[in-house]
Swiss-Prot record:
The name this protein goes by in its record: Chaperone protein HscA
Origin organism lineage: Bacteria, Pseudomonadati, Pseudomonadota, Gammaproteobacteria, Enterobacterales
Keyword set includes Chaperone: yes
Protein encoded by which gene: hscA
Organism: Escherichia fergusonii (strain ATCC 35469 / DSM 13698 / CCUG 18766 / IAM 14443 / JCM 21226 / LMG 7866 / NBRC 102419 / NCTC 12128 / CDC 0568-73)
Keyword check for Mitochondrion: no
Coiled-coil parts of chain: none
GO molecular function: ATP binding; ATP hydrolysis activity; ATP-dependent protein folding chaperone; unfolded protein binding
Free-text function comment from the UniProt entry: Chaperone involved in the maturation of iron-sulfur cluster-containing proteins. Has a low intrinsic ATPase activity which is markedly stimulated by HscB. Involved in the maturation of IscU.
Keywords on record: ATP-binding, Chaperone, Nucleotide-binding
Length: 616
């Protein structure tokens, strides 16, 4: 049965009108672009039949080249040939220099500490370099499909943080692409595999690419996959194999460690060629910088064994997080070109107790999964073929003190999904909490849509902030939202179900998203003001309680100073000056420091009364 589709507004295709979409695997070493044609996902080749595009850009004063042509210049013009730029995305210059000391580029720091690479074309940042790779892939797709792309899905490592993901989005925008979604690489592989297998049970996706390693533990059931746990290492991949082997060759050849960039590139190219050859041969002859020697697979295995072991330790942690044992895993899907290394396949097979699946091309599977997802998101799938994969069109959250909206699940999150967040009580002795579920992108309750209200009762009567309530949002594959609130110490809970998309048209959703962008600056200022007002109310509430209990600890003059500070805070909190409220809060804190210290001393004396030193 087809599901209610929750998707980005305006993406549904008219009858018989097919929109052009592509999936892009923006890899560290190689990149691919794929699309769905005649119901089948396939990667797109260049004019010479090559599907992989080396993630390399060579810059000159009058232009640049991408891919194989660029890689051919790597040894001749190292400083202007940028490769593995994905590793630099979202990182500071200091971080790059610490993590990747082997890079043969000259860097400068921008004003905010971000890296700028010196090239013949000028100073370039990683976003610009990535954009040039994306442009080349988009051009390949546009030519193959004979039309402009309506949208793309770009894959990223599961361990990419917000800065790295935002950098990828910026690169796509610079390349003139409309990003339908960023998709984690292991999830993309699971999409491709889930469509083809028809199996049910726990599956491990072992993704060892050029620059990153990811492990995902998934549960497949009737075509639906649920991510149980993920793990990995954002600074471990086949490139590290290459550098280890290059260092070994350098030592064997007696090449100085500080040799020029051309020799360094020649060493690296020789190492890459040897690694590839050793996947099929027991030994290989290496010629570099006038030296010739033999390297065996056994020697290579000794070099990389510690790195392979690191990946298996990450697998062990992911299994533990998922709550499953290795022998419960039915299949192990291998993703990434580095999984062709025999030692990797051997050790992974030993760890999981079964030979890993290699029937799906490990280089192509991520791009194929991205293409399938792009085809869905752009609106090409008829209802009868809808997958249980969709997105939340508008953020879901809760009303908090001051009329603010705290977003729990952001828009464009893939469903099914569950997210939890902890909240606490605002007043002393509070025994109930009203839960107001909101939908929208704005910062204030008045600008968002109310979905539901319910109350959690039976909260222990504790001081403000003493009770901890965990609120869990869960959206299932049908788009049904369940919200549960539970007081953690007692286990008392309340819940409600609501259909978050019900009653909203595509145009209304689009309008809400547009408003969030138009009023972004205004909303942020309003939120800052509301937060300061909430903090002022909290400070005054706490102070009034303290004065009611222990005013005797103050002299008349001291009490007057505190009362004046509190009155001033109460007055400015009625206005709209954020800085004035903040300063008034700081002033109350300053004027009450001695009072707070006396209250603490008094509490300690009361606690010790009637006890000897030995008892304490």
């Amino acid at each position: 049965m087809a599901l209610l589709q929750i998707s980005e507004p305006g993406l549904s295709a008219a009858p018989h009108q097919r929109r052009l979409a592509a999936g892009i695997d923006l890899g560290t070493t190689n990149s691919l672009v794929a699309t769905v044609r005649s119901g089948q996902a396939e990667t797109l080749a260049d004019h010479e039949g090559r599907h992989l595009l080396p993630s390399v850009v060579h810059y000159q004063q009058q232009g640049h080249s991408v891919g194989y042509d660029a890689r051919a210049n790597a040894a001749l013009d190292t400083a202007n040939t940028i490769s593995s730029v994905k590793r630099l995305m979202g990182r500071s210059l200091a971080d790059i220099q610490q993590r990747y000391p082997h890079l043969p580029y000259q860097f400068q720091a921008s004003e905010n500490g971000l890296p700028m690479i010196e090239t013949a074309a000028g100073l370039l940042n990683p976003v610009r370099v990535s954009a040039d790779i994306l442009k080349a892939l988009a051009a390949r797709a546009t030519e193959a499909l004979a039309g402009d792309l309506d949208g793309v899905v770009i894959t990223v490592p599961a361990y990419f943080d917000d800065a790295q993901r935002q950098g990828t989005k910026d690169a796509a925008r610079l390349a003139g692409l409309h990003v339908l979604r960023l998709l984690n690489e292991p999830t993309a592989a699971a999409i491709a595999y889930g469509l083809d297998s028809g199996q049910e049970g726990v599956i491990a996706v072992y993704d060892l690419g050029g620059g990153t390693f990811d492990i995902s533990i998934l549960r497949l059931s009737r075509g639906v996959f649920e991510v149980l746990a993920t793990g990995g290492d954002s600074a471990l991949g086949g490139d590290d194999f290459d550098h280890l082997l290059a260092d070994y060759i350098r030592e064997q050849a007696g090449i100085p460690d500080r040799s020029d960039n051309r020799v360094q590139r020649e060493l690296l190219d020789a190492a890459i060629a040897a690694k590839i050859a050793l996947s099929d041969a027991d030994s290989v002859t290496v010629n570099v910088a006038g030296w010739q020697g033999e390297i065996s697979r056994e020697q290579f295995n000794e070099l990389i064994a510690p790195l392979v072991k690191r990946t298996l330790l990450a697998c062990r942690r992911a299994l533990k997080d998922a709550g499953v044992e290795a022998d419960e895993v039915l299949e192990v899907v291998m993703v990434g070109g580095s999984t062709r290394v025999p030692l990797v396949r051997e050790r992974v097979g030993e760890f999981f107790g079964r030979p890993p699946l290699t029937s799906i091309n490990p280089d192509k599977v991520v791009a194929i999964g991205a293409a399938i997802q792009a085809d869905i998101l752009v609106g090409n799938k008829p209802d009868s073929e809808m997958l249980l994969l969709d997105v939340i069109p508008l953020s879901l959250g809760l009303e908090t003190m001051g009329g603010l909206v705290e977003k729990v699940i952001p828009r464009n999150t893939t469903i099914p999904v569950a997210r939890a967040q902890d909240f606490t009580t605002f007043k002393d002795g509070q025994t109930a909490m009203s839960i107001h579920v909101m939908q929208g992108e704005r910062e204030l309750v008045q600008d968002c849509r109310s979905l539901a209200r319910f109350a959690l009762r039976g909260i222990p009567a504790l001081p403000a902030g003493g009770a901890h309530i965990r609120v869990t949002f869960q959206v299932d594959a049908d788009g049904l939202l369940s919200v549960t609130a539970m007081e953690k110490s007692t286990g008392v809970e309340a819940s409600i179900q609501v259909k978050p998309s019900y009653g909203l048209t595509d145009s209304e959703i689009a309008s809400m998203i547009k408003d969030s962008m138009s009023y972004a600056e205004q909303d942020v200022k309003a939120r800052m003001l509301a937060e300061q007002k909430v903090e002022a109310a909290r400070v005054l509430e706490s102070l009034h309680g303290a004065l009611a209990a222990d005013a005797a600890l103050l002299s008349a003059a001291e009490r007057q100073v505190i009362d004046d500070a509190a009155a001033h805070l109460s007055e400015v909190a009625q206005g709209d000056d954020v800085d004035a409220i903040e300063q008034a809060i700081k002033n109350v804190d300053k004027q009450t420091q001695d009072f707070a210290a006396r209250r603490m001393d008094q509490s300690v004396r009361r606690a010790l009364k009637g006890h000897s030193v030995d008892e304490v």
